Amino acid sequence: DVYKRQINEFVAGPGFTAWWLMNNLEGWGGPNPESWYTRQEKLQKKIVKRMREYGIEPVLPGYCGMVPHNAKEKLGLNVADPGFWCSYHRPAFLQPEDERFEEISALYYRELTKLYGKTGFYAIDPFHEGGSTQGVNLDAAGKAIMKAMKKTNPDAVWVAQAWQDNPRTPMIEHLEAGDLLVLDLHSECRPQWGDPASEWCRKGGYGQHGWVYCMLLNFGGNIGLHGKMDALIDGFYDAKADVHAGRTLRGVGMTPEGIENNPVMYELVMELPWREHRFTRDEWLKGYVYARYGVEDEALQQVWDLLGNGIYNSPKEKIQQGTHESVFCARPGLDVYQVSSWSEMKEYYNPQDVIEAARLMVSVADKYQGNNNFEFDLVDVLRQALAEKGRLMQKVVTAAFRAGDKQVFELASQHFLHLILLQDQLLGTRKEFKVGTWIEAARSAGQTQEEKALYEWNARVQITTWGNRVAADQGGLRDYAHKEWNGILKDFYFMRWKAYFDYLACVLDGKQPEELDFYTLEEAWTKETGFYSSIPEGNTVVVAKNIFEEVF
């Protein structure tokens, strides 16, 4: 069936659907089997039904003008070409002047409503993350998008993400108040609501439109302690007090790319709307310790004082996309610092504070064995401490190589690799930190061996190379969604660093080894199908105590 094949060439695979829906790419990770669509429809209906039972209004994807990049050739449509995203061809944008805009958007909403009913909110993000708007009348485009949505539900609200230039000001400035709700996506770091101190400040904020104060916090689902506690609290109360922004502020939101990390920060952002007056991080953390562990304990209070004053309190002016990344997960290099291309991470805390927090947690670990929240945090804090140690050791390796000191190089590189294996062992005690949990979830979505293999490949690629060679290397996407997890540490990150150290050892021996092709090494793992268990191994407290004693 020609049409089905063409549709499948357009829709992205399960690991990359989010980027397809944001107009960043098409087709990558697919083609999907028919059972995938059936399964997703069934799941979506369950989610929407349950949301409505709870009185939650779902935000469904609205029509943003997206059509396949070859829609001009295939369908004769009048389109604008938004260009490329990290080497992927973006879908084209259907010009509002094309008479078929109305027809296609109406068809889209008709089918959507047939499946999931009408809603009061539709998510629409044209030209997300740098798409070219050349040749597009933005005012007309905004009005056409709004008109199409309103035909489906006259009371519906367009929901847009404020990220970089999206939504473009000319597209929204003439829309009626109340028709648009903007998610200020990165409020704790790069707010656009009108804060003059922000590098992404929009003069006049969002004008007449309502907006939501959102914490982004996590990029790529990366693992690592991180937060901007003071900036998050202060930013919210500053916005509330602002003459203009305070009038149009509608609430708070969470917009992370990956969840199941840094639970303390989600607790904190959700506290904001309930507290009329500004409060301090210190006073809030006192209550948090009891809420988190069900006990009052001086050592645990000290842990959170150290973390709250340090790694969880990145200053507002330190622009950083997510966590302080673990060097274990980096594509190797002598002066490697950040793992993903756009992390922009900065030194803003004392690593010794993290190690001291880990020591305190280990000191009371016997007392709280079996306390689930404590054991999760014990692993997470000790994981961060090991990553700090790894960063120091990697610098020793580099210094020894540059000094031509073979003995120190050999010792330091072996110690670094051993730290990766200890990290792997520690994380294996919790299912949340196991690559097996991730792969098992992906495989379980498939009905046949072929489907399971496709979904596993999507899952493996997303957390390693992310794309093909061009997207990974020139596009910068490799390691974007890296995971400091059990299984992948041992088999992927260890392998990569060992290959690099072997290469450097040859150089120290005066040989001229062939340059390493990292992508080839990485791609091999994405094609493997070796089993990873999701079942925790070892006693968390015993393993954590032993590792701490050995390393620190």
Could you tell me what each predicted segment is?
Residues 373-387, 391, 415, 441:
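Extended non-globular C-terminal regions
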Residues 347-361, 365, 380-402:
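C-terminal substrate/ligand-recognition segments
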Residues 485-552:
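Extended, compositionally biased alpha-helical segments that mediate assembly or anchoring
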Residues 28, 374, 394:
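Acidic/histidine-rich, surface-exposed loop or edge segments in extracytoplasmic proteins
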Residues 364-378, 426-441:
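Short, solvent-exposed, charged loop/turn and helix-capping segments
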Residues 382, 424-425:
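Substrate-recognition/cap regions that form aromatic- and gly/pro-loop-enriched pockets
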Residues 1-25, 29-308, 313-315, 320-324, ...:
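Catalytic-core regions of glycoside hydrolase
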